[in-house]
Amino acid sequence: LGYQVIIPGENRLLNGLRWDSRIDPRQWQPLPTVYERAAAAGIAAVHVTQGAFRGTGLTVATMRGADFRPADSMGALAAQAATALRESDRAFVTVYHGDLDGTGHAFGVGSDAWYNQLAHVDKLAEQLAGALPSGTYMCVTADHGMVDIGAEDKFDVDEHSDLRSGLALLGGEPRARHLYARRGAAADLLAAWRETLGDRAWVLSRDDAIKEGWFGPVDAAMTSRIGDVVAAPAGSLAIVATKAEPRESALTGMHGSLTPSEQLVPALMYTAA
């Protein structure tokens, strides 16, 4: 639902990347993962990624059921994936490499650094394709796109006290904000944000965002995690909070909104002969 969402019943946010030791990831995300479903069907399920991700809250919430194979270099990613595929007649293996995303955040999409990193990703895909057992199907894709945000496009909520009136918690991220209202203030909060941002952002109530399919099918138990108001910037606007979120506010590349550059991703298919 978002990078940072409210913990129902508590006046604090859960950051999905940093997690919170007080929150059990199995309860936070109770549905069977694709790895658990694969294993239940007799298919070997393996996830290959950086060793630092082993056992994190996000990994347990989304990747549990997978045989976690740590790999801290591109060469190791390709080798671990190939080994996992050779070990079983039927296998579902995912490989995650996050450096292209990190480079985009730091330097921007289309920067020299980003294109250099993209060349490394292309080489990784080539190595994976060359190591696949016959009949193996490979899909190379991404979990999101990205847009570049200039300093002039950063709208700092910390400098607009009128937009914080009635706001209990500012969640989400600069390109996908969840606004949690104080009791009875949701309607006024929605009106204030719409008036200030105008056509620079899509600003909807929780109910309208759900009706419009922003979050796909929403289980009733998850509804309260969504902001009372949600704001998705159009164009290259970013809704930052330089005091509360200095690190996120300083990024060059961002994602999370509804623009094609953020929602459309490549899907390259290959079947080994």
Predicted regions and their residues:
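Feature captures the catalytic ectodomains and active-site-proximal regions of enzymes
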Residues: 1-273
